[in-house]
UniProtKB/Swiss-Prot annotation:
Positions bound to [4Fe-4S] cluster 1: 99, 103, 106, 112
Taxonomic classification: Bacteria, Pseudomonadati, Pseudomonadota, Gammaproteobacteria, Enterobacterales
Protein name per Swiss-Prot or TrEMBL: NADH-quinone oxidoreductase subunit G
Stored InterPro entries: 2Fe-2S_ferredoxin-like_sf, 2Fe-2S_ferredoxin-type, Asp_de-COase-like_dom_sf, MoPterin_dinucl-bd_dom, Mopterin_OxRdtase, Mopterin_OxRdtase_4Fe-4S_dom, NADH_UbQ_OxRdtase_75kDa_su_CS, NADH_UbQ_OxRdtase_ferredoxin
PANTHER family: NADH-QUINONE OXIDOREDUCTASE SUBUNIT G, RESPIRATORY NITRATE REDUCTASE
GO cellular-component term (any): membrane
Quaternary assembly: Composed of 13 different subunits. Subunits NuoCD, E, F, and G constitute the peripheral sector of the complex.
EC numbers for this chain: 7.1.1.-
Example of a GO MF term: 2 iron, 2 sulfur cluster binding
Cofactor(s) the protein needs: [2Fe-2S] cluster; [4Fe-4S] cluster
Organism: Salmonella typhimurium (strain LT2 / SGSC1412 / ATCC 700720)
Record keywords: 2Fe-2S, 4Fe-4S, Iron, Iron-sulfur, Metal-binding, NAD, Quinone, Translocase, Ubiquinone
C-alpha cells in the first residue's frame, strides 16, 4: 500500500497502480480516454493531466499524465488545480476540432464516454471555425457500424483488437491529425470478439448495428441482470428492452467471470427472442390444425389427459433452468425424469463432473485462467465451443511478457513497455484437435489427429510426467520428441492449466486430461483443470441427474410410457430425427413446453408457450460449477394482453397442482428454490446465487429502468389511452419501473445497468468496483457449487487404440462454429449471414479416392435421408474421417463419431 495526498487529503491506495487508477478506485473523478483497466496505459490522449508536487511545501508543481505516473508512497497531486483543469479542457477542445458534434443523431448519445468527459472538463463552447477532416466509413459486417468522423484517435480500438484479442484485420493508417482506424478494405471483422469494440470505443465510431434497426437511447430501455444463454461459460450480460423486444445486449461486469468482455455470439445472438413465429399462446391439436387456448383451458386439458395416462415421462433440457428442470422432475417423478441428452454425451458430462468433484484438481474461474503460465488444450476447439475461455487463454499466453517486464520492475500497467520487453514472447500453449483451430496462431505446437490419437497423446504426456500413470505403446519417435517438449514445458510451469470438454465426443480425451492434471499435481504444481460443456445449464442438469434421451425414447417405443412432456428441447439435436419422430408418434400425449418453434412441435398434441431467458427468472450452472441467477427483463403481456408466456417452471407446477387438485404452492421463484434445495442437497448453494424477493435497499426495490426513462404513459396509447398498472414482480427484488434504487454505492451485486452521476457510458462500472478492474464492491454475483476435494481419483487406465482408417468407411469428426452451432443463436436473422454454408470436409487422399475436388457435391445416407453437401478439402483432417459442421440446421451434434459407408459424388 502507499499513501498519496490528493488536494490536501490523505488516502491509502495500492502502490502498484498508476495515479489515474488509484484515484478512480477512490471514487475521485479524473477524465480520461485512452486508458482502460484491461488495456493498461499508453498516455496517448493527454486527457488525464493532474498537477504533481515534490512535497507538501511545493506550491508550483508540474503537469503529469496520471495514467503514466505511479502511485508511489508520499505522492502529492492536485486534480482541482486551475492549470490542470484548463489543460484538460483544452485537450477536449483539441479533440473536438474534427468531431462532427452530431450527438442528436449519434447512436452513442446518452451512453457516450466522450460526452461524459466533455461535461466533466467543463468544455461547453467551441471556438474552432475551420474545415474539419472527413473520412469514408467502412462496411464492417452485420454486427458493427463504422462512423470514422467521430474518432478522437484514442487508439483504444486497435490496442484492444490487435494487442488484447490478437485480431489481425483492424489497424490504424495515416499520420499526425489524420489517422484512420479500420480494415485495409471493407469487409466483416474476423475476430470472434469484435463486438467489444462497441464498448471499448469511447465515442460513436463503432456502434452496435443490430441495435440500429430498432434503436433506443440507453435511458429509454429496461434492463435486468442476466446470464448469456449461448454456451456453458456463463458470462454476465445486461439485456435492454423496449416495446416488448430485446434491443441490445451489453456486457455486465463480473470481476470473477467475464469482467469487461463478451464474445460475439453472446453479444449479438439474441435475435431468437424477437422472432415472430414463437409460441405466444398455448395451443392444442385438433386434427391437422391447432386451436388456441387460454391458460385455464390448457391446464385442465393437459391435466385430464395426464390423469388418464398410465405412465408419464419428462424430458428435460440443458438449456432450461434448474428450476424448470426440477418442476418437470416433480411433475413426472424422479424415476421418470430424463435429461434430454444423448447417452454418449451424458456419459461424458458425468465423467467431467466426476473429475471436477473428485479429481482433487482446482477448477479456475474464467478470469483466473488468465493467470496460468502453461496451457494444454485437449480435444476442444475452444474458440468455437467456449469462446470467452479462448480470449482468457490468449491473455494467459501473453503473461510471459508481463513476467519478463516484472523481472525488470516494470509496472503491470505500463503496457507499451511490456510489449517492447516481451517482443511477442509467450507462455507455452499446446492444442490438439481434429483440424485447425483459431488458437493455432499463438500455440507453441498443434496436433491434428482423430480423437483416439489425441487421447493417446494425453495419456503419454501423463505417463512421461509420472511413470505410475498408464503407458502408451506404439508412439513414434517424432511424436515422442514433441511429447518430451510438452512435458518439459508443463513440468517447468508454476501454474499449468489443462482444458478439455465434452464436445470432442470422446470420454478418453477427458480421462487423458484428468491424468495429465493428476500427474502435474503429483509433481507439486498448482495445476488447474477446465471442462467445457455444451449448453448453458449442462452442468446443472448433470448434477440433477436422470436417464438419457435414449432411455426415454426406449420407454416410448416399447409403449411403457404413454405420455411425454418435453421441456425446452429440440430432440432432433440429441438423437436420430427418424427415431424421435417414430417414438413420439406412438405416444397418445406429447406435450411440448418451449419458447421456440421446434421440429418436434409437429408431433405435439399440446404446446405450452414458455418464456425465454429475457422474460423469466431462473438459475443456471456454468462449466466451473458456478450457480448464477438470470432475471426477467420485461413482461411480454404488458404490451399484448393476448400473450400467455409463462416461465416453464410456472406452467409445469400449475399443471402438477391441477392434476393433484390442490392449490399452487410455488407462487414465487424463492419457493421453487427452497423446494429444489429440500429435495436435492447438492443445490443448497443456489440460494446464495442472488438475494431473495424480500431484498430491499432503504425499503426500495431495485429499478430496472434508468431514472430518465421516458414515454411510459404513451407506450400503449395505440391500444388504449388508459395506462395500465406496471407489471408487479413478486419473484425478485427488482421493479418494472424507474422508481427504485439504482445508486452505485448501494449494497448490491445484481446490477441491471451501469450508470452513475456523470458517468453514462460503460465506463460507469468503475463506480461499482472495490478497485477499478477488480471485483464488484459488494462481491461478484454467483456461488460455486463444486470445489476440489483433498483426495483425488486414481489414474484412468484404459488407453484407446490408435485410429485406423477403413476402406469404404468414414467416421464423422465434429467441427464447431461460433456462428451456427448453437441451437438458439442460429435462429437469429443477423447470425445467418455469418453462418457458413453446410459442408463436408475431406482429407486430400480421400477426395482423390472418391474423385472429387473442392466444391464438388457429394452425397451420403443417414437416418433414412440422403444428405448432399459441397466438399471442402483439409490437409489437417486425418484420412478415414469426414468433417461436418455440428449443430448447423440438419446436422445434429449427435452425429459426432457416427460412421458413413456410402459416401459418393452426388448425381447432377
Amino acid at each position: 500500500m502507499a499513501t498519496i495526498h490528493v488536494d490536501g487529503k490523505e488516502y491509502e491506495v495500492n502502490g502498484a497502480d498508476n495515479l489515474l487508477q488509484a484515484c478512480l478506485s477512490l471514487g475521485l473523478d479524473i477524465p480520461y480516454f485512452c486508458w482502460h483497466p484491461a488495456l493498461g496505459s499508453v498516455g496517448a490522449c493527454r486527457q488525464c493531466a493532474v498537477k504533481q508536487y515534490q512535497n507538501a511545501e511545493d506550491t508550483r508543481g508540474r503537469l503529469v499524465m496520471s495514467c503514466m505516473t505511479p502511485a508511489t508512497d508520499g505522492t502529492f497531486i492536485s486534480i482541482d488545480d486551475e492549470e490542470a483543469k484548463q489543460f484538460r479542457e483544452s485537450v477536449v477542445e483539441w479533440l473536438m476540432t474534427n468531431h462532427p458534434h452530431d450527438c442528436p443523431v449519434c447512436e452513442e448519445g446518452g451512453n457516450c464516454h466522450l460526452q461524459d468527459m466533455t461535461v466533466m472538463t467543463g468544455h461547453s463552447f467551441r471556438r474552432y471555425r475551420f474545415t474539419k477532416r472527413t473520412h469514408r466509413n467502412q462496411d464492417l459486417g452485420p454486427f458493427i457500424s463504422h462512423e470514422m468522423n467521430r474518432c478522437i484517435a484514442c487508439y483504444r480500438c486497435v490496442r484492444y483488437y490487435k494487442d488484447y484479442a490478437d485480431g489481425t484485420d483492424l489497424g490504424v493508417y495515416g499520420a499526425h491529425d489524420n489517422v484512420y482506424f479500420g480494415r485495409p478494405e471493407d469487409g466483416t471483422l474476423e475476430s470472434e470478439f469484435s463486438g467489444n469494440l462497441v464498448e471499448i470505443c469511447p465515442t460513436g465510431v463503432f456502434t452496435d448495428k443490430t441495435h440500429s434497426e430498432r434503436y433506443n437511447r440507453k435511458w429509454d430501455m429496461q434492463f435486468a441482470p442476466s446470464i448469456c444463454q449461448q454456451c456453458s461459460i456463463g458470462c454476465n450480460i445486461s439485456p435492454g428492452e423496449r416495446y416488448g423486444e430485446l434491443r441490445r445486449i451489453e456486457n455486465r461486469y463480473n470481476g470473477t467471470v467475464n469482467h469487461y468482455f463478451l464474445c460475439d455470439r453472446g453479444r449479438f445472438g439474441y435475435g431468437y427472442v424477437n422472432l415472430k413465429d414463437r409460441p405466444r399462446q398455448p395451443v392444442q391439436r385438433r386434427g391437422d390444425d391447432f386451436i388456441t387456448l387460454n391458460a385455464e383451458q390448457a391446464m385442465q386439458g393437459a391435466a385430464d389427459i395426464l390423469r388418464q395416462s398410465k405412465k408419464v415421462i419428462g424430458i428435460g433440457s440443458p438449456r432450461a433452468s434448474i428450476e424448470s428442470n426440477f418442476a418437470l422432475r416433480e411433475l413426472v417423478g424422479a424415476e421418470n425424469f430424463y435429461t434430454g441428452i444423448a447417452r454418449g454425451e451424458q456419459e461424458r458430462l458425468q465423467l467431467a463432473l466426476k473429475v471436477l468433484r473428485e479429481g482433487g484438481i482446482y477448477t479456475p474461474a474464467l478470469r483466473e485462467i488468465e493467470s496460468y503460465d502453461a496451457v494444454l488444450v485437449l480435444g476442444e476447439d475452444v474458440t468455437q465451443t467456449g469462446a470467452r475461455v479462448a480470449l482468457a487463454v490468449r491473455q494467459a499466453v501473453k503473461g510471459k511478457a508481463r513476467e519478463m517486464a516484472a523481472a525488470q520492475k516494470v509496472a503491470d500497467w505500463q503496457i507499451a513497455a511490456i510489449l517492447n520487453i516481451g517482443q511477442r514472447a509467450k507462455h507455452p500453449l499446446f492444442v490438439t484437435n481434429v483440424d485447425d483451430t483459431r488458437l493455432d496462431d499463438i500455440a507453441a505446437w498443434t496436433y491434428r489427429a482423430p480423437v483416439e490419437d489425441q487421447a493417446r497423446l494425453g495419456f503419454a504426456i501423463a505417463h512421461a510426467l509420472d511413470n505410475t500413470a498408464p503407458a502408451v505403446d506404439g508412439i513414434d519417435s517424432d511424436l515422442q520428441n514433441k511429447i518430451d517438449v510438452i512435458v518439459q514445458a508443463l513440468a517447468g510451469a508454476k501454474k499449468p492449466l489443462i482444458i478439455s470438454g465434452t464436445n470432442a465426443g470422446s470420454s478418453e480425451v477427458i480421462q487423458a486430461a484428468a491424468n495429465v492434471a493428476k500427474a502435474l499435481k503429483g509433481r507439486g504444481a498448482d495445476v488447474g483443470i477446465t471442462m467445457i460443456a455444451r449448453s448453458v445449464n449442462s452442468m446443472g442438469l448433470g448434477m440433477m441427474g436422470g436417464g438419457s434421451l435414449d432411455d426415454a425414447l426406449g420407454e416410448l417405443e416399447t409403449g411403457s410410457a404413454d405420455a411425454v412432456v418435453v421441456l425446452e428441447n429440440d430432440l432432433h439435436r440429441h438423437a436420430s430425427a427418424t427415431r424421435v419422430n417414430a417414438a413420439l408418434a406412438k405416444a397418445p400425449l406429447v406435450m411440448v413446453v418451449d419458447h421456440q418453434r421446434t421440429a418436434i412441435m409437429e408431433n405435439a398434441h399440446l404446446v405450452l408457450s414458455a418464456a425465454s431467458f429475457a422474460e423469466s427468472d431462473g438459475t443456471v450452472i456454468n462449466n466451473e460449477g458456478r450457480a448464477q441467477r438470470f432475471f426477467q427483463v420485461y413482461d411480454p403481456a404488458y404490451y399484448d394482453n393476448k400473450t400467455i408466456m409463462l416461465e416453464s417452471w410456472r406452467w409445469l407446477h400449475s399443471l402438477h397442482s391441477t392434476v393433484e387438485n390442490r392449490e399452487v404452492d410455488w407462487t414465487q421463484l424463492d419457493h421453487v428454490i427452497d423446494a429444489v434445495i429440500a429435495a436435492m442437497p447438492q443445490f443448497a448453494g443456489i440460494k446464495d446465487a442472488a438475494p431473495d424477493a424480500t431484498f430491499r435497499i432503504r425499503g426500495q426495490k431495485l429499478a430496472r429502468e434508468p431514472h430518465r426513462y421516458s414515454g411510459r404513459t404513451a407506450m400503449r396509447a395505440n391500444i388504449s389511452v388508459h395506462e395500465p398498472r406496471q407489471p408487479q414482480d413478486k419473484d425478485t427484488m427488482f421493479a418494472f419501473s424507474m422508481e427504485g434504487n439504482n445508486q452505485p454505492t448501494a449494497p448490491r451485486s445484481e446490477i441491471p445497468f451501469a450508470w452513475a452521476p456523470g458517468w453514462n457510458s460503460p465506463q460507469a462500472w468503475n463506480k461499482f468496483q472495490d478497485e477499478v478492474g477488480g471485483k464488484l464492491r459488494h462481491g461478484d454475483p454467483g456461488v460455486r457449487l463444486i470445489e476440489a476435494t483433498e483426495g483425488g481419483l486414481d489414474y484412468f487406465t484404459t488407453v484407446p487404440a490408435s485410429f485406423q482408417a477403413q476402406d469404404g468407411q468414414w467416421r464423422i469428426a465434429p467441427y464447431y462454429h461460433l456462428f451456427g452451432s448453437d441451437e438458439l443463436s442460429q435462429r437469429s436473422p443477423v447470425f445467418q449471414s455469418r453462418m457458413p454454408q453446410p459442408y463436408i470436409k475431406l482429407n486430400p487422399a480421400d477426395a482423390a479416392k472418391l474423385g472429387v475436388n473442392a466444391g464438388t457435391r457429394v452425397s451420403f445416407s443417414y437416418d433414412g435421408n440422403t444428405v448432399t453437401l459441397p466438399v471442402e478439402i483439409s490437409e489437417g483432417l486425418a484420412a478415414g474421417q469426414v468433417g461436418l459442421p455440428m449443430g448447423m440446421p440438419g446436422i445434429a451434434p449427435v452425429l459426432a463419431g457416427a460412421r458413413l459407408e456410402d459416401l459418393r459424388e452426388a448425381q447432377q
